[in-house]
Amino acid sequence: MKMEASVRLRALAIAVTSGVMLLVPLGGIVSLGGIALAAPASPSPASDPAGSSIITIGDSVMLGARWVLEKDGIEVVDAVKNRQASAGSGLLKKRGSNLPMNVVVHLGTNGTFTADDCRAMIAAAGPTRRVFFLTLAVPRPWEAKNNAVIRNCVAANPGRAFVIDWNASVEQHPKWVYSDGTHLRPAGAKGYSRMIEQAVAAAP
């Protein structure tokens, strides 16, 4: 039983596609080595000291999950309304050596997310830290382009940057968000927090 559980954990919603480490939440269907796997459902994790190794940087979407992120042990949740992706690198630079090992970014909801924005955030995080970028679920003209930028940027920075596919999660769980297709209902906030913690734990 222990071995079976260990295998399931290692199979935790990780798919390698075109050089991109793609992380999606439990309960989803993922492709691993060409084989479709249905990841088992899992309850929200209990508060964990590992959360202190994570900082999250985001906008109003992340702000809607702040109460769960903090409850689940993530000590630093830096999220404000209307934040643009261009602000990300400056926020990371201000924290400097105080940044934890894992940086989670959810920006681009409110406008353009450029390749320069992405590269600047990875550089600002420093060479020893991992940066996780959530894809966007925002029914606006810039959604597809921003998500493509995120995926391409991550593919160009293997081992340092990772994609957490929030867009796919919202497609799978449309009731996680309100009628605007973007902001989180309580169930979505819980799924959002769980997804981030599991992605960080599963990344190599």
Regions found by a protein language model. Give the residues of each.
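N-terminal secretory signal peptides that target proteins for export/translocation
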Residues: 1-7
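Sec-dependent N-terminal signal peptides
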Residues: 8-30
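C-terminal region of N-terminal signal peptides and the immediate post-cleavage residues
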Residues: 23-50
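Conserved SGNH/GDSL esterase-like catalytic core that processes O-acyl groups on lipids
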Residues: 48-120, 138-145
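Hydrophobic/aromatic beta-strand patches that form the interior of the parallel beta-sheet core
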Residues: 55-57, 132, 162-164
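A short helix->loop->beta-strand "cap" motif at the edges of active sites that frequently abuts
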Residues: 127-131
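Catalytic His-Asp segment of secreted/periplasmic serine-dependent ester chemistry enzymes
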Residues: 143-204
